[in-house]
Amino acid sequence: MKKIRPLTEADVTAESAFFMQRRQVLKALGISAAALSLPSTAQADLFSWFKGNDRPKAPAGKPLEFSQPAAWRSDLALTPEDKVTGYNNFYEFGLDKADPAANAGSLKTEPWTLKISGEVAKPFTLDYDDLTHRFPLEERIYRMRCVEAWSMVVPWIGFPLYKLLAQAQPTSHAKYVAFETLYAPDDMPGQKDRFIGGGLKYPYVEGLRLDEAMHPLTLMTVGVYGKALPPQNGAPIRLIVPWKYGFKGIKSIVSIKLTRERPLTTWNLSAPNEYGFYANVNPHVDHPRWSQATERFIGSGGILDVQRQPTLLFNGYANEVASLYRGLNLRENF
Protein backbone atom coordinates (compact mmCIF):
# COMPACT_ATOMS: atom_id res chain seq x y z
CA MET A 1 0.00 0.00 0.00
CA LYS A 2 1.33 3.40 -0.91
CA LYS A 3 2.16 5.73 1.91
CA ILE A 4 -0.78 7.94 2.76
CA ARG A 5 -0.15 11.66 2.62
CA PRO A 6 -0.01 12.85 6.23
CA LEU A 7 -2.77 15.09 7.50
CA THR A 8 -2.02 17.93 9.82
CA GLU A 9 -3.82 19.32 12.80
CA ALA A 10 -4.74 22.29 10.66
CA ASP A 11 -6.97 20.04 8.59
CA VAL A 12 -8.86 18.32 11.40
CA THR A 13 -12.52 19.26 11.79
CA ALA A 14 -13.44 20.68 15.18
CA GLU A 15 -15.50 18.25 17.23
CA SER A 16 -18.61 20.40 17.36
CA ALA A 17 -19.17 20.72 13.62
CA PHE A 18 -19.32 17.07 12.80
CA PHE A 19 -22.70 16.03 11.52
CA MET A 20 -25.30 17.81 9.39
CA GLN A 21 -28.82 16.62 9.08
CA ARG A 22 -30.85 14.90 6.40
CA ARG A 23 -34.57 14.93 7.09
CA GLN A 24 -36.08 11.74 5.80
CA VAL A 25 -34.26 11.51 2.47
CA LEU A 26 -32.55 14.80 3.15
CA LYS A 27 -31.09 17.23 0.76
CA ALA A 28 -27.62 18.56 1.05
CA LEU A 29 -26.99 21.62 3.12
CA GLY A 30 -26.10 24.72 1.11
CA ILE A 31 -25.12 28.34 1.53
CA SER A 32 -26.43 31.45 -0.24
CA ALA A 33 -27.81 30.77 -3.72
CA ALA A 34 -26.93 27.12 -3.57
CA ALA A 35 -29.11 26.74 -0.50
CA LEU A 36 -32.22 27.43 -2.53
CA SER A 37 -32.13 23.87 -3.84
CA LEU A 38 -31.94 22.43 -0.34
CA PRO A 39 -34.56 21.82 2.34
CA SER A 40 -35.45 24.67 4.65
CA THR A 41 -34.70 22.46 7.65
CA ALA A 42 -31.13 21.97 6.47
CA GLN A 43 -30.75 25.69 5.81
CA ALA A 44 -32.02 26.46 9.29
CA ASP A 45 -29.59 23.93 10.74
CA LEU A 46 -26.63 25.60 9.10
CA PHE A 47 -27.36 29.02 10.52
CA SER A 48 -28.43 27.82 13.97
CA TRP A 49 -25.29 25.72 14.21
CA PHE A 50 -23.03 28.73 13.90
CA LYS A 51 -24.84 30.86 16.47
CA GLY A 52 -22.27 29.70 18.94
CA ASN A 53 -23.31 29.78 22.58
CA ASP A 54 -26.44 27.62 22.51
CA ARG A 55 -24.71 24.52 21.13
CA PRO A 56 -24.98 21.40 23.30
CA LYS A 57 -21.89 20.40 25.23
CA ALA A 58 -20.37 17.03 24.44
CA PRO A 59 -20.07 14.63 27.38
CA ALA A 60 -16.49 13.95 28.42
CA GLY A 61 -15.15 10.54 27.47
CA LYS A 62 -12.49 8.65 29.37
CA PRO A 63 -8.90 9.13 28.13
CA LEU A 64 -7.59 6.30 25.96
CA GLU A 65 -4.12 4.84 25.55
CA PHE A 66 -3.07 4.79 21.91
CA SER A 67 -0.13 5.16 19.57
CA GLN A 68 0.25 7.77 16.84
CA PRO A 69 1.87 5.99 13.88
CA ALA A 70 3.62 8.32 11.46
CA ALA A 71 1.70 6.87 8.51
CA TRP A 72 -1.56 8.23 9.90
CA ARG A 73 -0.42 11.71 10.88
CA SER A 74 -1.36 14.61 8.68
CA ASP A 75 -0.83 18.28 8.01
CA LEU A 76 -4.54 18.78 7.41
CA ALA A 77 -6.36 21.22 9.68
CA LEU A 78 -8.51 19.42 12.21
CA THR A 79 -12.14 20.19 12.72
CA PRO A 80 -12.59 21.49 16.30
CA GLU A 81 -13.64 18.89 18.85
CA ASP A 82 -16.83 20.66 19.89
CA LYS A 83 -18.07 20.62 16.30
CA VAL A 84 -17.30 16.93 15.85
CA THR A 85 -19.21 15.98 19.00
CA GLY A 86 -21.97 18.58 18.84
CA TYR A 87 -23.11 18.42 15.23
CA ASN A 88 -24.20 14.92 14.32
CA ASN A 89 -26.36 12.71 12.16
CA PHE A 90 -27.62 9.92 14.41
CA TYR A 91 -31.34 9.61 13.72
CA GLU A 92 -31.89 7.22 16.59
CA PHE A 93 -31.70 10.37 18.74
CA GLY A 94 -33.47 12.84 16.47
CA LEU A 95 -33.19 14.59 13.12
CA ASP A 96 -31.67 17.93 14.10
CA LYS A 97 -27.90 18.12 14.23
CA ALA A 98 -27.99 19.07 17.92
CA ASP A 99 -30.39 16.27 18.87
CA PRO A 100 -27.82 13.47 19.29
CA ALA A 101 -25.69 15.45 21.73
CA ALA A 102 -28.80 16.52 23.62
CA ASN A 103 -30.51 13.12 23.71
CA ALA A 104 -27.85 10.41 23.51
CA GLY A 105 -27.11 10.53 27.23
CA SER A 106 -29.81 7.88 27.56
CA LEU A 107 -27.65 5.37 25.67
CA LYS A 108 -26.27 2.67 27.96
CA THR A 109 -22.89 1.47 26.73
CA GLU A 110 -21.92 -0.68 29.72
CA PRO A 111 -22.30 -3.59 29.57
CA TRP A 112 -21.88 -4.02 25.81
CA THR A 113 -21.46 -7.03 23.55
CA LEU A 114 -20.30 -7.13 19.95
CA LYS A 115 -20.96 -10.46 18.25
CA ILE A 116 -18.87 -11.65 15.28
CA SER A 117 -20.64 -14.47 13.43
CA GLY A 118 -21.69 -15.87 10.08
CA GLU A 119 -19.26 -17.32 7.56
CA VAL A 120 -16.35 -17.60 9.99
CA ALA A 121 -14.46 -20.54 11.44
CA LYS A 122 -14.19 -18.99 14.89
CA PRO A 123 -17.15 -16.82 15.90
CA PHE A 124 -16.68 -14.86 19.10
CA THR A 125 -18.08 -12.03 21.18
CA LEU A 126 -16.35 -8.94 22.52
CA ASP A 127 -17.41 -7.24 25.74
CA TYR A 128 -17.07 -3.58 26.64
CA ASP A 129 -13.49 -3.83 27.92
CA ASP A 130 -12.42 -5.84 24.87
CA LEU A 131 -13.33 -2.94 22.61
CA THR A 132 -10.46 -0.82 23.95
CA HIS A 133 -8.05 -3.50 25.17
CA ARG A 134 -8.11 -6.52 22.87
CA PHE A 135 -6.40 -4.75 19.98
CA PRO A 136 -3.74 -2.01 20.14
CA LEU A 137 -5.33 1.38 19.54
CA GLU A 138 -3.93 4.02 17.24
CA GLU A 139 -4.90 7.54 16.29
CA ARG A 140 -5.60 8.19 12.63
CA ILE A 141 -6.34 11.58 11.16
CA TYR A 142 -8.90 11.01 8.41
CA ARG A 143 -10.91 13.17 6.09
CA MET A 144 -14.63 12.68 6.63
CA ARG A 145 -17.10 13.46 3.81
CA CYS A 146 -20.86 13.53 4.32
CA VAL A 147 -23.20 12.76 1.42
CA GLU A 148 -24.75 16.17 2.19
CA ALA A 149 -21.65 17.81 0.65
CA TRP A 150 -19.87 18.92 3.81
CA SER A 151 -16.63 17.58 5.22
CA MET A 152 -14.40 17.48 8.27
CA VAL A 153 -11.00 16.22 9.32
CA VAL A 154 -11.10 14.09 12.45
CA PRO A 155 -8.51 12.37 14.71
CA TRP A 156 -10.18 9.00 15.23
CA ILE A 157 -8.86 6.33 17.59
CA GLY A 158 -9.38 2.66 16.90
CA PHE A 159 -8.02 -0.52 15.35
CA PRO A 160 -8.16 -1.91 11.79
CA LEU A 161 -11.22 -4.05 11.13
CA TYR A 162 -9.05 -6.66 9.41
CA LYS A 163 -7.46 -7.55 12.76
CA LEU A 164 -10.85 -8.43 14.20
CA LEU A 165 -11.89 -10.37 11.10
CA ALA A 166 -8.60 -12.27 11.01
CA GLN A 167 -9.31 -13.63 14.48
CA ALA A 168 -12.71 -14.85 13.30
CA GLN A 169 -11.13 -16.55 10.25
CA PRO A 170 -13.55 -15.90 7.37
CA THR A 171 -14.49 -18.99 5.38
CA SER A 172 -14.16 -19.26 1.61
CA HIS A 173 -17.89 -18.51 1.37
CA ALA A 174 -17.58 -15.07 3.01
CA LYS A 175 -18.03 -12.30 0.44
CA TYR A 176 -19.56 -9.47 2.46
CA VAL A 177 -19.65 -8.07 5.98
CA ALA A 178 -22.97 -6.97 7.51
CA PHE A 179 -23.13 -4.56 10.46
CA GLU A 180 -26.01 -3.82 12.81
CA THR A 181 -26.62 -1.03 15.32
CA LEU A 182 -28.04 -1.61 18.78
CA TYR A 183 -31.83 -1.82 18.86
CA ALA A 184 -32.99 -0.23 22.12
CA PRO A 185 -36.15 1.84 21.61
CA ASP A 186 -36.32 2.83 25.27
CA ASP A 187 -32.86 4.43 25.00
CA MET A 188 -33.05 5.52 21.36
CA PRO A 189 -36.24 7.54 20.84
CA GLY A 190 -35.89 7.60 17.07
CA GLN A 191 -36.33 3.83 16.98
CA LYS A 192 -39.62 4.10 18.84
CA ASP A 193 -41.12 7.10 17.06
CA ARG A 194 -41.02 7.33 13.25
CA PHE A 195 -41.33 11.12 13.40
CA ILE A 196 -38.26 11.43 15.62
CA GLY A 197 -36.31 8.82 13.65
CA GLY A 198 -37.02 10.08 10.15
CA GLY A 199 -39.16 7.13 9.11
CA LEU A 200 -36.21 4.79 8.69
CA LYS A 201 -36.47 1.09 9.42
CA TYR A 202 -34.47 0.14 12.51
CA PRO A 203 -32.11 -1.22 13.62
CA TYR A 204 -29.72 0.61 11.31
CA VAL A 205 -27.79 -1.80 9.10
CA GLU A 206 -24.80 -1.37 6.82
CA GLY A 207 -22.48 -3.53 4.77
CA LEU A 208 -19.17 -3.77 2.94
CA ARG A 209 -17.58 -6.16 0.53
CA LEU A 210 -15.08 -8.36 2.33
CA ASP A 211 -12.13 -6.81 0.50
CA GLU A 212 -13.30 -3.35 1.57
CA ALA A 213 -13.62 -4.51 5.16
CA MET A 214 -10.14 -6.04 5.08
CA HIS A 215 -8.52 -2.88 3.69
CA PRO A 216 -6.03 -1.30 6.14
CA LEU A 217 -7.86 2.05 6.04
CA THR A 218 -11.11 0.57 7.40
CA LEU A 219 -11.23 1.39 11.09
CA MET A 220 -13.23 0.11 14.03
CA THR A 221 -13.39 3.32 16.00
CA VAL A 222 -13.68 3.65 19.78
CA GLY A 223 -12.43 7.18 20.38
CA VAL A 224 -11.92 10.68 19.07
CA TYR A 225 -9.72 13.53 20.24
CA GLY A 226 -7.87 11.28 22.67
CA LYS A 227 -10.99 10.11 24.51
CA ALA A 228 -13.62 7.40 24.28
CA LEU A 229 -16.38 8.13 21.78
CA PRO A 230 -19.27 10.13 23.22
CA PRO A 231 -22.71 8.57 22.66
CA GLN A 232 -23.66 10.99 19.90
CA ASN A 233 -20.67 9.88 17.84
CA GLY A 234 -21.54 6.20 18.03
CA ALA A 235 -20.24 4.93 21.37
CA PRO A 236 -18.87 2.56 22.27
CA ILE A 237 -17.76 1.41 18.79
CA ARG A 238 -18.46 2.53 15.25
CA LEU A 239 -17.15 2.02 11.73
CA ILE A 240 -15.08 4.53 9.77
CA VAL A 241 -14.46 3.94 6.04
CA PRO A 242 -12.77 7.21 5.00
CA TRP A 243 -13.17 6.87 1.24
CA LYS A 244 -16.95 6.45 1.52
CA TYR A 245 -19.75 8.84 2.44
CA GLY A 246 -20.40 9.16 6.14
CA PHE A 247 -23.65 7.19 6.25
CA LYS A 248 -21.58 4.03 5.74
CA GLY A 249 -20.02 4.70 9.16
CA ILE A 250 -22.53 2.75 11.21
CA LYS A 251 -22.60 3.61 14.92
CA SER A 252 -23.06 1.72 18.21
CA ILE A 253 -22.42 -1.65 16.57
CA VAL A 254 -23.62 -4.87 18.23
CA SER A 255 -23.26 -7.34 15.35
CA ILE A 256 -20.74 -8.05 12.60
CA LYS A 257 -21.80 -10.94 10.39
CA LEU A 258 -19.92 -12.31 7.40
CA THR A 259 -22.27 -13.32 4.61
CA ARG A 260 -22.37 -14.94 1.18
CA GLU A 261 -24.85 -12.43 -0.22
CA ARG A 262 -24.74 -8.64 -0.29
CA PRO A 263 -26.44 -7.37 2.87
CA LEU A 264 -29.27 -4.86 2.97
CA THR A 265 -28.32 -1.35 4.07
CA THR A 266 -30.58 1.23 5.68
CA TRP A 267 -30.28 4.25 3.39
CA ASN A 268 -30.24 2.12 0.26
CA LEU A 269 -33.50 0.52 1.43
CA SER A 270 -34.99 3.94 2.16
CA ALA A 271 -34.06 5.59 -1.15
CA PRO A 272 -32.16 3.26 -3.52
CA ASN A 273 -31.99 5.85 -6.30
CA GLU A 274 -30.22 8.29 -3.98
CA TYR A 275 -28.04 6.19 -1.68
CA GLY A 276 -26.12 3.32 -3.23
CA PHE A 277 -24.53 0.32 -1.57
CA TYR A 278 -20.99 1.41 -2.41
CA ALA A 279 -21.31 5.10 -1.48
CA ASN A 280 -17.78 5.89 -2.61
CA VAL A 281 -16.99 9.61 -2.55
CA ASN A 282 -17.02 10.68 -6.19
CA PRO A 283 -17.12 14.26 -7.51
CA HIS A 284 -18.27 12.96 -10.91
CA VAL A 285 -21.41 11.22 -9.65
CA ASP A 286 -23.95 13.70 -8.33
CA HIS A 287 -26.71 13.00 -5.88
CA PRO A 288 -30.02 13.23 -7.78
CA ARG A 289 -30.79 16.48 -5.97
CA TRP A 290 -27.41 18.19 -5.61
CA SER A 291 -23.87 18.25 -6.93
CA GLN A 292 -21.04 16.33 -5.31
CA ALA A 293 -18.35 18.25 -7.22
CA THR A 294 -17.53 20.47 -4.25
CA GLU A 295 -17.92 20.35 -0.49
CA ARG A 296 -18.04 22.71 2.47
CA PHE A 297 -15.17 22.07 4.84
CA ILE A 298 -16.16 22.65 8.45
CA GLY A 299 -13.22 23.97 10.40
CA SER A 300 -12.63 26.28 13.32
CA GLY A 301 -14.34 29.38 11.94
CA GLY A 302 -17.92 30.58 11.89
CA ILE A 303 -20.39 30.62 9.02
CA LEU A 304 -18.51 33.28 7.08
CA ASP A 305 -15.36 31.16 7.27
CA VAL A 306 -16.81 27.93 5.87
CA GLN A 307 -14.56 26.91 2.99
CA ARG A 308 -15.85 25.41 -0.24
CA GLN A 309 -13.34 23.11 -1.85
CA PRO A 310 -13.25 20.52 -4.63
CA THR A 311 -14.40 17.04 -3.71
CA LEU A 312 -11.59 14.49 -4.07
CA LEU A 313 -12.19 11.12 -5.72
CA PHE A 314 -12.46 8.50 -2.99
CA ASN A 315 -12.17 11.43 -0.57
CA GLY A 316 -8.45 11.74 -1.31
CA TYR A 317 -7.65 8.05 -0.81
CA ALA A 318 -7.66 7.00 -4.48
CA ASN A 319 -4.04 5.83 -4.41
CA GLU A 320 -4.92 3.40 -1.64
CA VAL A 321 -8.34 2.10 -2.71
CA ALA A 322 -8.97 2.67 -6.44
CA SER A 323 -7.67 -0.81 -7.27
CA LEU A 324 -10.58 -2.30 -5.30
CA TYR A 325 -12.94 -1.06 -8.01
CA ARG A 326 -10.95 -1.79 -11.17
CA GLY A 327 -13.40 -2.61 -13.95
CA LEU A 328 -16.43 -1.50 -11.93
CA ASN A 329 -18.69 1.16 -13.42
CA LEU A 330 -18.73 3.76 -10.63
CA ARG A 331 -21.72 5.60 -12.08
CA GLU A 332 -23.91 2.52 -12.04
CA ASN A 333 -22.44 1.19 -8.80
CA PHE A 334 -22.66 4.41 -6.79
From Swiss-Prot:
InterPro entries: MsrP, OxRdtase_Mopterin-bd_dom, OxRdtase_Mopterin-bd_sf, TAT_signal
PTM remark: Predicted to be exported by the Tat system. The position of the signal peptide cleavage has not been experimentally proven.
Cofactors (names): Mo-molybdopterin
Entry function: Part of the MsrPQ system that repairs oxidized periplasmic proteins containing methionine sulfoxide residues (Met-O), using respiratory chain electrons. Thus protects these proteins from oxidative-stress damage caused by reactive species of oxygen and chlorine generated by the host defense mechanisms. MsrPQ is essential for the maintenance of envelope integrity under bleach stress, rescuing a wide series of structurally unrelated periplasmic proteins from methionine oxidation, including the primary periplasmic chaperone SurA and the lipoprotein Pal.
Organism of provenance: Salmonella dublin (strain CT_02021853)
Name of the featured protein: Protein-methionine-sulfoxide reductase catalytic subunit MsrP
Molecular-function GO terms, alphabetical: metal ion binding; molybdopterin cofactor binding; oxidoreductase activity, acting on a sulfur group of donors, quinone or similar compound as acceptor
Subcellular location: Periplasm
Catalytic activity reported: L-methionyl-[protein] + a quinone + H2O = L-methionyl-(S)-S-oxide-[protein] + a quinol; L-methionyl-[protein] + a quinone + H2O = L-methionyl-(R)-S-oxide-[protein] + a quinol
Keyword Membrane belongs to the record: no
